[in-house]
Every structure is written in structure tokens, then in C-alpha cells.
Design a protein with these regions (language model features):
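Conserved FAD/dinucleotide-binding core of flavoprotein oxidoreductases
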Residues: 1-47
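FAD-binding beta-loop-beta segment adjacent to the flavin cofactor pocket
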Residues: 47-70
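Short, histidine-centered active-site or binding-site loop motifs used for metal coordination
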Residues: 4-8, 68-69, 75
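Short, cationic motifs built from Arg/Lys/His that form the positively charged side of catalytic pockets
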Residues: 1, 13, 61, 113-114
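Extended, folded domain segments that form the structural surfaces/walls around functional sites
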Residues: 84-94
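A conserved FAD-binding loop/helix module that cradles the flavin
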Residues: 74-84
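C-terminal helical "tail/cap" subdomain of flavin- and related membrane-associated enzymes
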Residues: 30-33, 75-77, 92-171
Length: 171
């Protein structure tokens, strides 16, 4: 899977498959001896780099989970993980409610889910800011980004933090 940052407002009509391959080849030129192996694209889409958390995940008997409650940018690959953890928390709570008349899980669902959601949001946004340049960023932000990339490249501790978050936090 490859991601190429495009300007806000771009459309797929501006990015035929050949242009995507040319852009990737240009970016990998000099980095990889093999270059880019071209082939048919399975999917081409534009994914907005946005985050959102709807902090009210329960209204009476209605519970929100997954994308209805939170959106993360694709950079951190956390969307499906968060949806699965929401469903795991909620299913445990519903089972306890219907089998044992225990509502503690339903009462605590929102707080428990949000604690994990905000950690994943933080990580996804960190990676997004680390890997992407935004038009509103100035010279200072660009230098900070380069300094952070340099720090990550040279710090085993920071690489461990990124790996732990990328693999996924425990339920």
C-alpha cells in the first residue's frame, strides 16, 4: 500500500494510474536499488488526513462504535483496531448486562473506549505530522519535523515507542 500526499481539493481525475506510478518512482529514485515495480492498482482513492472524536458514545440505549464515534487519518493504521476494541468492550458489556444483569460495563463503556481512542488518535496524529507537510506549516514547523525524524532515526527508545503504538495498544 502506498500513500501520496496531494493538495486539498485534488480529485482522482487528476491522478491517473500512470501519474501515480511516475510520482512513486520519482520519490524512490536513489533510495531503492530495485526502484518501483509497476503493476495494476487494486484501489486508488483520496483519503483525507483528518481526525475526529465524538466524545458522547452513549445516548440512552444507543452506543456508538468505530467510525461513527471516531475518525483517524490512515497514517497510523488505527481505524480498524479502534473499531474492533470498541466492539470488544461493548460486547463484553452487553453480555454482562443480559446474562448477569450487570450494567457496570455499559456504564463504563464510554470512558474505557475513549481512553484507548485518545491514545490511538495521538499516535495517528503524531505520525501524520511526522510524515506529511501541511500548506499552513512554515519554516519552523518544517525544521521541527526534520529534527523529529532525525531523532526517531537515531533513538532506539523512540523507535520502540513507535513500534509499540503501531502494533497496537493492549485491550
Amino acid at each position: 500500500r502506498y500513500y501520496i500526499q496531494v493538495a486539498q481539493g485534488e480529485t482522482l481525475a487528476n491522478w491517473p494510474e500512470e501519474r501515480l506510478w511516475d510520482e512513486l518512482a520519482g520519490r524512490f529514485d536513489g533510495i531503492s536499488e530495485q526502484g518501483v515495480t509497476r503493476g495494476p492498482a487494486l484501489e486508488i482513492s483520496i483519503a483525507p488526513l483528518r481526525s475526529y472524536v465524538f466524545e458522547t458514545m452513549r445516548h440512552g440505549r444507543l452506543f456508538l462504535a468505530g467510525d461513527s464515534a471516531h475518525i483517524v487519518p490512515p497514517t497510523g493504521a488505527k481505524g480498524l483496531n479502534l473499531a474492533a476494541s470498541d466492539v470488544a468492550y461493548l460486547s463484553d458489556a452487553l453480555i454482562a448486562h443480559y446474562r448477569r444483569d450487570d450494567d457496570a460495563g455499559l456504564t463504563g463503556y464510554q470512558a474505557k473506549a475513549l481512553a484507548r481512542i485518545w491514545k490511538a488518535e495521538r499516535f495517528s496524529w503524531y505520525l501524520t505530522k511526522l510524515m506529511h507537510h501541511f500548506p499552513e506549516d512554515g519554516a519552523f514547523e518544517h525544521r521541527m519535523q526534520i529534527a523529529e525524524l532525525d531523532y526517531v532515526a537515531g533513538s532506539e527508545a523512540m523507535q520502540t515507542v513507535i513500534a509499540e503504538n503501531y502494533v497496537g495498544l493492549p485491550l
